[in-house]
């Protein structure tokens, strides 16, 4: 069965508290979604603002492969606003639960039914494709909900949507009301699930199993309050889990991780490390038992291949690590400790872990070199001097001095802020000496307050396209950023050096 993917990242996703996108940003995300292969892009709510209308027009003008839809309340003013920006497809809604009727709309059930019918008829009379949505459907009286769906179907609706507006449904109940909608309307049915109880994806899948043909989803599950059903989790669950029926989507799954990171950066919402499919830890392993299993056969502790979603697996050496995982990491660099050496290295790593320290790849190699008496394994790049200057009315600049493999280099550069200036100065040195460039930079706050800890994540890339990532945590954003870049440079340059040494041997 082919399942239709209706992406509402640009509408419901943007309603996440604190998220606000420019028209240009919405356009770039729309292009990414189209490349990913979604069937429908809900581009926004035309009545909201001039910027929203501009964004929708820009997206429509791109002539993307995906259908472009816009939100409209069940009234002529909203529908006219959608028509004015050039939309041919609207998602129109009105609440049907008694709590919404009493406290928000101040309408009777008969009045709500009349408005729903009128909106659908008006939209169809203007030549629009109309998807009707009964807001708060899962808390609505079931018989009244069936009546509304039946009447809007008679009025000409093209599609019916069942929103679990406050994430109140269970998978079983979602299946029941989906069957109701399919039987009453004989129309294609969509499900729109929120994640207030962590059941959005499960409810969406249950709706599909019960006869729905489409799910409303967002990248990374962003959305109001606790968010919406996550596109990546929903798609991969349909594709990989055993449901007794084969489901297909048009999603290019190898682009999921890249799309997730792209959206995360633009909306300013960090993806939690343990998030399914796209979280940093989704294909990371530290435990010795798990690492040994994965090295023998990845399927022992991975339900899917990371490459299927544009990822790679990674191993972490820490207090829970085992000999097999550690040796596999060292083997990558041509280092083969004997049994006694391996145990010594692992003991040192575990001792650091017991002290609450995170052992980086470079630190592991340094420990290994000391135990194995290997020469030439060291931190290739060392920060020997660093200062920044910034202020109102002055251009921020930074001075950086690096020791690279025994040679001193220094540079100064400007930037839009002290962090940018510092990274530009480092880039000025490394671009000339080692052909390594800073590919990506991310910043997240770990704790609150003026003395909050920040976490900086960076990616660096060499001329051959090899990429290394590094993280640093600290109270000072500028210093932490510089340290993360230095760690990343050491990783990629040390990896290159040891691989050359391995080939030479």
Where are the predicted features?
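A mid-to-C-terminal "edge-of-domain" accessory segment
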Residues: 2-3, 9, 236, 243-412, ...
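Mixed-charge, glycine-accented linear interaction segment located at domain edges/termini
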Residues: 466-469, 473-502
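Small-residue-enriched alpha-helical segments and adjacent helix-cap loops
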Residues: 397, 405-434, 439-446
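Positively charged, aromatic-enriched nucleic acid-contacting surfaces
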Residues: 398-402, 446-469
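Small-aliphatic-rich amphipathic alpha-helix that forms the alpha element of a beta-alpha
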Residues: 192-219
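Hydrophobic alpha-helical scaffolding
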Residues: 19, 45, 68, 72, ...
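Alpha/beta enzyme core
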Residues: 3-5, 12-41, 54, 58-62, ...
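C-terminal helical cap(s) of enzyme catalytic domains, especially alpha/beta-barrels
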Residues: 59, 223-250
